[in-house]
Amino acid sequence: GLEAESPVEAVVRLTLNEQPRDAFVAACMVMHSLSGFDRFNLGDSREKCEHIRRDMLAQLGRCPNHSGYLRAQALIKAADGGCDNVFEASVLWIIKSLYSGRVVTQYPIIIGDNTYFGDIVLPDLKIIVEPDGRTKFGDNEQEVRENTGKWLSRQHDLANAGWRVIRARWHDTDD
């Protein structure tokens, strides 16, 4: 049969040889996919991601003399399976490149009877970074109208609780 590399092997190859952002995004997406990440079951999802990370690091351990070894190790350690898509992973890459404090994906914020999940959160600063995608609002006019109302209510609740929400658009990741 045709021999192919596993997703974990592919991530290790990418982290060793490709551009750091692209490799980081790939590592996040593989973790997300293989873990079946579910924000409503964060403990189990994060545990599965850590198992996948250990597999990636073990695979990387087979290449200790590669010139990109230390960079690959850092990328794998920084990857996060809580990113739902390539855009979120790209934004996370930028944040982790600029900020050394705690960064958490799919961070639950409880306000009254509501639980909101911040896509990318700097909890110590009470900052939520939300990569904006049109798909979050729906596929037709009625869904967009309903979801826009929910979004405005969410924004109001978060702001009143002292959270600052920063919106990121795809073109913000170009540089």
Predicted regions and their residues:
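Short gly/ser-rich loop at a beta-strand->alpha-helix junction or flexible surface loop bordering the NTP-binding
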Residues: G1-G68
